[in-house]
Amino acid sequence: MNPAHLLVLSAVCVSLLGAAIVPPQPLNLIQFSSLIQCANGGSRATWHYADYGCYCGKGGGGTPVDELDRCCQTHDNCYGEAEKLTKCSPYYKTYKYDCSEGKLTCNDAPGSCERSVCDCDRVAAICFAGAPYNDKNFMINTETNCQ
């Protein structure tokens, strides 16, 4: 075998091995982002909510800093309830929904994991759209501000 071909083949194999150990990314974050954009009419990019206050983004704790942060706390708690359903992983569960003129509708069967997760995201998206956004609460130091 040609050494150049062997080198390319080795690189591909190593790449595939590396990809096999990369954990899957939460699929429904894309859907949640779409629901947020539907509810707020695209007025604020969804990444603004990824690291806001004490609860928006990964994890959460302490006292919410404002109304928007309370929306995130409620969303976290809602996902916690959804996780109690059999085989329900909210961060990886996708669902069916419609967005029409800012109105969000979840279309999966009531009581299903998919519907529960969609309802969590729908309520949060509507809450985000109605809550004031305070720039000073974006990327705060959670260790000192979230007691």
UniProtKB/Swiss-Prot annotation:
SUPFAM superfamilies according to UniProt: Phospholipase A2, PLA2
Cofactor note: Binds 1 Ca(2+) ion.
Domain of life: Eukaryota
InterPro entries the record matches: PLipase_A2, PLipase_A2_Asp_AS, PLipase_A2_dom, PLipase_A2_dom_sf, PLipase_A2_His_AS
Enzyme Commission number(s) of this protein: 3.1.1.4
Active-site residues annotated for this sequence: 75, 121
Keywords: Calcium, Disulfide bond, Hydrolase, Lipid degradation, Lipid metabolism, Metal-binding, Secreted, Signal
Localization: Secreted
A Pfam family: Phospholip_A2_1
Positions annotated to bind Ca(2+): 55, 57, 59, 76
Keyword Membrane in record: no
Signal peptide annotation: 1-19
Principal localisation: secreted
Function as written in the Swiss-Prot or TrEMBL entry: PLA2 catalyzes the calcium-dependent hydrolysis of the 2-acyl groups in 3-sn-phosphoglycerides.
Protein name: Acidic phospholipase A2 2
Organism: Bungarus flaviceps flaviceps
Lineage: Eukaryota, Metazoa, Chordata, Craniata, Vertebrata
